[in-house]
Amino acid sequence: QHGTARWATDKEIREAFLHIPFTPNLWREGKNLPQNQGLVVGSIPRKKYATALVDSGDVHCLMIGASGVGKTAYYLYPNIEYACASGVSMLVTDTKGDVVRNYGTIAKEKYGYDVVLIDLRNPTRSSGFNMLSLISKYADLYKGNPNDLRSKAKMEKYAKICAKTIIQAGGSGDYGQNSYFYDSAEGLLAATIMLVAEFCSPEKRHIVSVYKLIQELLAPSRTKGKNQFQILMEKLPPEHKARWMAGAALNTGEQAMLSVLSTAMSRLNAFIDTELEQLLCFDSAVDAERFTSQKTALFIVMPEEDPTAYFLVSLIIQQLYRELMTVADEHGGKLPGRCVFYCDELGTIPKIEGIEMMFSAARSRGLMIVAIVQGLIQLERNYGKEGAQIIRDNCQLTIFGG
């Protein structure tokens, strides 16, 4: 006995997708640019040029191919070329640095893209990625116009997104009996992020300042019955949202408060690295709002030989995704411009927390995800059988290379 699943015939494949002449030489001169955005899923050889088979729908794709079959050269590169020609903003994970070397200059000079390189192999030569960028932007707008409640609301929302991303970066989000401490740490972290964005000078608005402030708040207090954090919060107006966000941590005993502060510190410890500070402490070269409104190519180069920085890849993807969903919600549930995440070697990098939800929720909002793996077993190892199945079920396209 067997089910009804089968391989598609050549005729069915040709009828299911758009046929677009794949002419990168003309595209790079600004000629015959494709009008339909989408993913390249195959090609038909012609005498003078190939015809690309393009799925123009909002779809996710799972590309499976063993090491050495040409996943990057024969699948990723044509898709990046087509994305550039059709004006889609993209995020690309790059384990060897080959992708940005081969396509960074082309995207910038031939297609007019804003190219951003997050280089975790050589952080001192990387573009900046300040996690507090959007929070600081709206803090300044609100400070300039206290009646601008929209900017105030955005500042608070992005602060909560940043805090949630950092807290969940180290675990699944299911903390059992310790959930109180992690939830409280998330609120405390959001409050501290808001304080840094609102009151620090521009050059000090970054995640390392958040770490230093929490570290100082751990110091013993001279006021009996109050810790340093409570004293700091009392200096704020009663209606300040930082006091509200930190409410669970403020109204607790001294020992519990220290545990909450320590939990937040443990999540921030990973950021204390002299090299990583070079990209975390300076202005961001890109944020979610620019990413979806301007043609942008964000390349993340990951050091294969040093997995200690891989957590930052997960963090960048999570934060950009959450911020993009916020932008989509403000535009009627759809991003102003289509975007795609090309997650090359998704099975090699550590688990990206909440990726199952990303695959479930992103598609209808105009964000496509392309997961490139060496085998399904890699997904099961990182996300478990259930998580791997969710990812597979949410990929409308599955392509095997070999």
What positions do the PLM features span?
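Conserved ATP-driven motor cores of ASCE-family P-loop NTPases powering translocation/secretion/packaging/pilus
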Residues: 359-402
